[in-house]
């Protein structure tokens, strides 16, 4: 399986990838995007099985990327890994088609709880 990790911070992408590996998802291919626009292009080209995205990024935000994917007919599983964890943000994410929102700071357990049903 292929996971697309999208965040404008290279360090945060590495932290997400390390946490995925610690949570037991070390046999998945992981690809990276620096913003929502790049992620949108990569979903078409790379066909990931899951997109993990930050919310706030330049060029195109995570929520804009998700909305664009859904408008284009893509049903790729999509979840947020972001510092925005308010009930309003969770509701907006769910209404746009996100399967989950993992709030920073996160643990490997947060990843297992969110991803076990998606990557099984």
What are the language-model segments listed below?
Residues 64, 85-100:
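Alpha4 helix (beta4-alpha4-beta5 surface) of REC/receiver domains from two-component response regulators
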Residues 35-38, 61-64:
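Acidic catalytic/metal-coordinating carboxylates
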Residues 46-52:
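Active-site beta3 strand of CheY-like receiver
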Residues 10-31:
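Two-component/phosphorelay signaling modules centered on CheY-like receiver
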Residues 88, 106-115:
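C-terminal output helix
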Residues 8, 104:
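A Lys-centered signature of the CheY-like receiver
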Residues 54, 82:
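Active-site residues of response regulator receiver
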Residues 57:
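Receiver (REC) domain active-site loop signature in two-component systems and cognate sites
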